[in-house]
Curated annotation (Swiss-Prot):
Record's protein name: DNA repair protein RecO
InterPro entries referenced in this protein's UniProt entry, alphabetically: ARFGAP/RecO, DNA_rep/recomb_RecO_N, NA-bd_OB-fold, RecO, RecO_C
BP terms from Gene Ontology: DNA recombination; double-strand break repair
UniProtKB keywords: DNA damage, DNA recombination, DNA repair
Organism: Laribacter hongkongensis (strain HLHK9)
Length: 242
């Protein structure tokens, strides 16, 4: 007899896991076709449970589950390999990104493009092939766009094109206005670099402005909800001048 709500062969990453009942784990996963899902990994906390070693964040997985309630049951899991484990600053960054997804992406709301963006980000973090700040800022904006909070970065509130040599005050939920009387002070150069995804060769000043602006945008989207990982990430960013 087939199990109700049976799903197989789903690309996934673990976002978070916590104890559930006596021997199980409640695992939040980000999947490509189903978005964020909550799955019970039965027996995963038993001393010799091999499945627990697979339930690590930032490892590409293929999973299956069954059930029709808000919390389903994990039935299959295979490690897809190919990425080294994160450590140091990339690890802190990864936990920060996972917490953002947990807060902003609703369960059972598919975001295939965002999943692909996340997978690309994790690959960059794991391989250390590029600087962290530009790819993290890019993903933050991709997440905001996917969840309905995309800012307009190339035009001001009057609809005029943003000028690279001007200074703006950016108010999340509204936009950019010439001058810096209100909102987050940011240069037009930074707004255009963010809009064009062109932070790879940006100056330290532009990267700092981009970090502060994105933080303001995310704070607005989170409606004041605090992130446990942000304080540590800010310390790391300050030390690295990202």
């Amino acid at each position: 007899m087939s199990q109700p709500g049976k799903v197989k062969g789903q690309q996934a990453f673990v976002l978070h896991a916590q104890p559930y009942k006596e021997t199980s784990l409640l695992v939040e996963m980000f999947t490509r076709e189903h978005g964020r899902v909550g799955l019970v990994a039965r027996g995963a906390r038993r001393p010799r449970a091999g499945i627990r070693a697979l339930l690590l964040p930032f490892s590409p997985l293929e999973v299956g589950w069954f059930g029709k309630s808000d919390i389903r049951t994990l039935s299959d899991i295979d490690w897809q390999g190919g990425l080294p484990q994160l450590a140091g600053t990339p690890l802190v960054t990864g936990f920060y990104v996972n917490e953002l997804i947990m807060k902003l992406v609703a369960r059972d709301d598919p975001h295939e493009g965002l999943f692909d963006d996340y997978r690309t980000l994790i690959a960059h973090l794991a391989r250390g092939s590029v600087a962290i700040a530009p790819v993290l800022r890019r993903f933050e904006l991709q997440l905001l766009a996917a969840t309905g909070y995309a800012p307009t970065l190339d035009r001001d509130l009057a609809g005029e094109p943003v000028r690279a040599d001007a200074v703006y005050g950016f108010v999340p939920g509204e936009g950019a206005r010439p001058g810096a009387e209100r909102g987050c002070e940011v240069s037009g150069q930074t707004l255009l670099a963010l809009d064009h995804g062109a932070l790879d060769q940006a100056s330290a000043a532009v990267l700092r402005e981009a970090r502060f602006l994105n933080r303001a945008l995310l704070t607005h989207a989170l409606a004041g909800t605090e992130l446990a990982s942000r304080a540590l990430l800010n310390e790391v960013a300050a030390l690295s001048d990202n």
